[in-house]
Curated annotation (Swiss-Prot):
Decomposes formic acid to hydrogen and carbon dioxide under anaerobic conditions in the absence of exogenous electron acceptors. Its cofactor is [4Fe-4S] cluster; Mo-bis(molybdopterin guanine dinucleotide). Inhibited by aerobic conditions. Its EC number is 1.17.98.4. Mo-bis(molybdopterin guanine dinucleotide) binds at residues 110, 140, 176, 179-180, 201-202, 204, 221, 223, 297, 335, 404, 408, 428-429, 445, 478, 581-582, 585, 587, 678-679. CDD domains: MopB_CT_Formate-Dh_H, MopB_Formate-Dh-H. The keyword Lyase does not apply. This is Formate dehydrogenase H. Residues 1-56 form the 4Fe-4S Mo/W bis-MGD-type domain. One of its GO terms (cellular component) is membrane. It is an enzyme of class 1 (oxidoreductase). The active site is at K44, U140. It comes from Escherichia coli (strain K12). Consists of two separable enzymatic activities: a formate dehydrogenase component (FDH-H) and hydrogenase-3.
């Protein structure tokens, strides 16, 4: 029996785990002494590992390459040589016929690791010749990256998660740490124990609201109106840090002019928050010696997501809560390596290390390093644009790695149509997902636990994860698969191990250069920027100590007028749907749904959280099946009745197959980042009279879908 150190493959807290291996099989997980988790884990950390053993609770592991010879036909098992040759030939032909931008690729924010994401974006740019590479940050924290880049020059958390423990105030805005990042929630609790004030801003009574000094239960979709009113109070009452504003920022007067029009009284109807509460929150935040803002997708998944990020950041600038310990702006990234996927350049506008593709010097640098004459100068397509790009014939092929857009993207009917329109769909994954079932080519890869590499935690912390067991089937690592396709397409790409890849990318990224494999070791946690390979440089806990990463070193004030969400409530669709997370399952559920303990927590068709008064008015009982309708479709789900949701809104998680709430969500893309407005969809909830028939319908539909995916996986 042995123990292998790794990093949890679920959320981005970056928890260290010891996998206990007996006779070549993982038998349990134990908490390790990681910097963030400090010997603790959540239930996913303890019980979220047995998917690797192909439990087939939900869907089987992919075990051999497969090709679908014609649309409508079955997937057929083939050798690796045949599959890789086929992919190389088809991609080359599409590139030749339609141009490189006819091919869309994705990185993966899950267990593939930073090295694989680096190789994938290099493949897209140097081999295909396109910047069409993206990752799931597009549908979650893309607005955080864009907004923070504009405001402070850096799109990541400005503080270490551990710093939360010793701040004087935690401002939790549009973020549910107990469900999304339980170990981060522990640090919020630590802060409370240490005397910190807690402000929670969320329409629901989330778990953190139970320990909050103040819970601002604002109306769905009113974020900017509230933030502008808080800024108004801080300036009006002379609570802002004049020295910080004068020496380290610019744009204050323009900001002041906008928030002047947002008195607390003027936004009471918009926000549903009293003027006195707004003033109390503004004073509490401004008067704290140090204050850390934590936000999640309750900020970013709105049409005005980027603007909300910048408005939050302006509050921090206004009060001098940047560039010092325990104070800052912190988008707590969702999936375990979504920060890493962005760090590695799995974005359509940046090379690794956030070096922008439109800068000629950056293009020249990476072209030289990768041995190509030139690289494309224009920003690539976003993955959320795929339905539109495919419909207009701009994208003809998609190479999807470790993502399940047919489950996780908005307006799923449009996404399905896009995949039908494509000439070639390549899926590289570990499970037969909905997206994999639509593929023309399946490339089965090793899983977390079967390979090694580096993840980046939400707070910029590089950590190594290690191989625990040998893969049982005919699998290759993700970076090996991509490298072999590149070589077959005439671009020799040969790596012997992940360290060779890591060292290549380090030398191209000054902020990452000092984070060597040796320095990370088993339990090391190196937060970029880390620019020196010496042991003296252990990374950077908090950012902006001396200057901001903007061109002139100054933070940029910004806000704008509040605009109502795009989807409108009507008599036909009188309630708001907001998609959320839950603690027991993760993302598209392909991993957690195949873990025995986690799968036992809940099953299809999932839940719609609904307020007790709304349920009573509609004649809906707790646990009853209901129909939820939107302008884009309808789904069946189970009512979860309580006083936690606000009246007039329902909340659903997106991982369920039958109760797939993304069937309902209208995309309503942000004009800046093309992030869908998952947090505001007009819906109607209807009770179902014949509950017995509805229960049987769920069972039948679930079994049909599981059977279809299992048959596809077994070819």
């Amino acid at each position: 029996m042995k123990k292998v150190v790794t990093v949890c493959p679920y959320c981005a807290s970056g928890c260290k785990i010891n996998l206990v291996v007996d006779n070549g099989k993982i038998v349990r997980a134990e908490a390790a002494q990681g910097k963030t988790n400090q010997g603790t884990l959540c239930l996913k950390g303890y019980y979220g590992w047995d998917f690797i053993n192909d439990t087939q609770i939900l869907t089987p592991r992919l075990k051999t390459p497969m090709i679908r010879r014609q649309r409508g036909g079955k997937l057929e098992p083939v050798s690796w040589d045949e599959a890789l040759n086929y992919v190389a030939e088809r991609l080359s032909a599409i590139k030749e016929k339609y141009g490189p931008d006819a091919i869309q690729t994705t990185g993966s924010s899950r267990g593939t690791g930073n090295e694989t994401n680096y190789v994938m974006q290099k493949f897209a740019r140097a081999v295909i010749g396109t910047n069409n590479v993206d990752c799931c940050a597009r549908v979650u924290h893309g607005p955080s990256v864009a907004g923070l880049h504009q405001s402070v020059g850096n799109g990541a958390m400005s503080n270490a998660i551990n710093e939360i423990d010793n701040t004087d105030l935690v401002f939790v805005f549009g973020y549910n740490p107990a469900d999304s990042h339980p170990i981060v929630a522990n640090h919020v609790i630590n802060a409370k124990r240490n005397g910190a004030k807690i402000i929670v801003c969320d329409p629901r009574k989330i778990e953190t609201a139970r320990i909050a000094d103040m819970h601002i239960a604002l109306k769905n979709g009113s974020n900017i109106a509230l933030l502008n009113a808080m800024g108004h109070v801080i300036i009006e009452e002379n609570l802002y840090d004049k020295a910080f504003v004068a020496s380290r920022t610019e744009g204050f007067e323009e900001y002041r002019k906008i928030v002047e029009g947002y008195t607390p009284e003027s936004v009471e109807d918009i926000t549903g928050v009293s003027a006195s509460e707004i003033r109390q929150a503004a004073r509490m935040y401004a008067q704290a010696k140090s204050a850390a803002i934590l936000w999640g997708m309750g900020v970013t998944q709105f049409y005005q997501g980027v603007e909300t990020v910048r408005s939050l950041t302006s509050l921090a600038m206004l009060t001098g809560n940047l560039g010092k310990p325990h104070a800052g702006v912190n988008p707590v990234r969702g999936q375990n390596n979504v920060q890493g996927a962005c760090d590695m350049g799995a974005l359509p506008d940046t090379y690794p290390g956030y070096q922008y593709v439109k800068d000629p010097a950056n293009r020249e640098k990476f072209a030289k390093a990768w041995g190509v004459e030139s690289l494309p100068a224009h920003t690539g397509y976003r993955i959320s644009e795929l339905p539109h790009r495919a419909a207009h014939g701009e994208v003809r092929a998609a190479y999807i790695m470790g993502e399940d857009p047919l489950q996780t993207d908005a307006e799923l009917s449009a996404v399905r149509k896009a995949f039908e329109d494509l000439e070639l769909v390549i899926v590289q994954d570990i499970f037969m997902t909905k997206t994999a079932s639509a593929a023309d080519v399946i490339l089965p890869s090793t899983s977390w636990g079967e390979h090694e590499g580096v993840f980046t935690a939400a707070d910029r912390g590089f950590q190594r994860f290690f191989k625990a067991v040998e893969p049982k089937w005919d699998l290759k690592t993700d970076w090996q698969i991509i490298s072999e396709i590149a070589t077959r397409m005439g671009y020799p790409m040969h790596y012997n191990n992940t360290q060779e890849i890591w060292d290549e990318l380090r030398h191209l990224c000054p902020d990452f250069y000092g984070a060597t494999y040796e320095k990370m070791g088993e339990l090391g946690f190196i937060q970029w920027p880390c620019r020196d390979t010496s042991d003296a440089d252990q990374g950077t806990s908090y950012l902006f100590k001396e200057k901001f990463d903007t061109p002139n070193g100054l933070a940029q004030f910004f806000t704008c007028d509040w605009v109502a969400p795009i989807d409108k409530l009507t008599d036909e669709y009188p309630m708001v749907l907001s998609t959320v997370r839950e603690v027991g399952h993760y993302s598209c559920r392909s991993m957690t749904g195949n873990c025995a303990a986690l799968a036992a927590l809940a099953d299809e068709p999932g839940y719609a959280q609904i307020n007790t008064e709304d349920a009573k008015r509609l004649g809906i009982e707790d646990e009853a099946l209901v129909w939820v309708h939107s302008r884009k479709g309808k789904i069946i789900t189970r009512a979860q009745v309580s006083d936690r949701p606000n009246k007039g809104a329902i909340y659903m998680t997106y991982q369920w197959w039958i109760g797939a709430c993304n069937e309902l969500v209208t995309e309503n893309l942000s004009p800046i980042t093309k992030t869908p407005e998952y947090k505001y969809c007009a819906v109607r909830v209807e009770p179902i009279a014949d509950q017995r028939a509805a229960e049987q319908y769920v069972i039948d539909e679930y079994n049909k879908l599981k059977t279809r995916l299992r048959e596809a996986a077994l070819a």
